Design a protein with these regions (language model features):
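C-terminal domain-boundary segment and adjacent tail
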Residues: 26, 59-77, 98-105, 111-163
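Catalytic domains of cell-wall/extracellular-matrix polysaccharide-remodeling enzymes
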Residues: 2-98, 130
Length: 163
């Protein structure tokens, strides 16, 4: 019984912390947070038989919840916007990212690249040289790539797909 109470407290704590963060973001930046990035891609709290997902909480609070180090591209017709795949771009070259872009384009999928800091070195660093090549590729109209903030894409998907 004690474990259940702790788990509920953790879920409540998560909700309270996110609400407080959203309030601060609004106060400091004047914008409303619409997209949530799961810390380290973790979508649950607790252990063993007491494990509980907080995806339903994110679903109520945000238009989109993004994972981390996922392996699959996002199918806009099927995806659960409260837990879409985020594919790591930290430490990757453009040659490693390009096949993912081409696969997404070919199959009508959505590629969500996720990274941490930007620079030329470090374990969780998106390489500036890769970003430069990526931007040049995306800006070329002949490549027919739509790039937009995740929240904008989520709104488009929600508006245009049939449930």
């Amino acid at each position: 019984m004690v474990k259940s109470k702790l788990l509920c407290k953790r879920l409540n704590d998560i909700q309270n912390e996110i609400t407080e963060c959203n309030t601060r973001i609004k106060e400091l930046l004047g914008v409303t947070a619409e997209v949530f990035a799961y810390p380290c891609g973790q979508k649950f709290v607790g252990r063993d038989t007491n494990t509980k997902s907080y995806v339903p909480l994110i679903s109520k609070m945000f238009i989109l919840g993004r994972g981390w180090r996922d392996e699959a591209l996002v199918d806009p017709l099927f995806c659960d916007l409260s837990q879409v795949s985020g594919i790591e771009m930290d430490g990757k070259s453009f040659d490693e990212i390009l096949p993912l872009i081409e696969e997404a384009k070919k199959n009508g999928q959505w590629l969500i690249l996720a990274g941490h800091e930007m620079g030329e070195g470090g374990v969780q660093t998106t390489q500036l040289s890769m970003l430069k090549q990526l931007i040049e590729y995306i800006q070329n109209p002949s490549n027919q790539i739509w790039i937009a903030p995740a929240g904008t894409v989520a709104e488009y998907i929600e508006k245009n797909r049939q449930h």
